[in-house]
């Protein structure tokens, strides 16, 4: 109770009776039995604790939730449960998520629009289907190529992954390369159409980047 009700207390929302009822509703919303109200945190499983964290985040009825690696520490089966819960809550409450993850399978499942970052900078953003089918930036291509296929006979070609597509912006091929010593080339986001943007030399043509 204390964990989930803390945002309500901090923001002076309702009296004690209202908070108890609100916490009960939030527990039910995330699939936990309201009888768990007075249990201690150590008695919950990892998946249950994550549900409690989601309930706490929903206490103030936000429109936007920042989910920073919300399933990375969970078993795969529990990950699926939490992701399905987040999708259900999105539909029911009309939520928008900013979802941070290193797991491309999770991103593919949960995201509508994907933004790829490297070295603290946005390098490519596009609708999910576009990004997975038509990646343009070499770093995005390397990320997707690094996902292992469930086939023991197909080994990852690590050499090809490193050829000009490392996480070092100075090693990227032109027109994507970011060189700290180059004061003349201006790097920015180029509009490729249909909400697809890629970071490159601003003098490069969109048609040339896509081809």
Predicted segments with their positions:
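Charged, flexible cofactor/metal-binding loops and thiol motifs
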Residues: 34, 128-210
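A short, proline-enriched helix->beta-strand linker immediately N-terminal to the Walker B motif
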Residues: 59-63
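A short, surface-exposed alpha-helical micro-motif characterized by mixed small hydrophobic
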Residues: 107-109
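Conserved ABC ATPase signature
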Residues: 40-44, 48
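Conserved ABC ATPase "signature" region
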Residues: 18-35, 144
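Hydrophobic anchor residue at the start of the ABC signature
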Residues: 54, 82
């Amino acid at each position: 109770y204390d964990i989930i009700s803390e945002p309500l207390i901090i923001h002076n929302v309702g009296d004690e009776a209202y908070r108890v009822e609100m916490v009960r509703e939030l527990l039910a919303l995330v699939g936990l039995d309201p009888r768990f109200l007075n249990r201690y945190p150590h008695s919950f499983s990892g998946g249950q604790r994550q549900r409690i964290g989601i309930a706490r985040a929903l206490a103030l009825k936000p429109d936007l939730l920042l989910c920073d690696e919300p399933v990375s520490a969970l078993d795969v089966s529990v990950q699926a449960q939490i992701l399905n819960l987040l999708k259900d809550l999105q539909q029911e409450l009309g939520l928008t998520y900013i979802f941070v993850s290193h797991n491309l399978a999770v991103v593919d499942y949960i995201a509508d629009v994907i933004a790829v970052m490297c070295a603290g900078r946005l390098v490519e953003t596009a609708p999910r289907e576009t990004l997975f089918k038509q990646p343009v930036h070499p770093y995005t291509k390397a990320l997707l190529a690094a996902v292992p296929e469930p086939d023991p006979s197909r080994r990852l070609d690590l050499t090809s992954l490193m050829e000009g597509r490392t996480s070092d912006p100075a090693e990227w091929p032109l027109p994507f390369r970011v060189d700290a010593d180059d004061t003349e080339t201006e790097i920015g986001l180029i509009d490729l159409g249909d909400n697809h943007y890629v970071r490159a030399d601003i003098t490069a043509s969109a048609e040339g980047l896509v081809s």
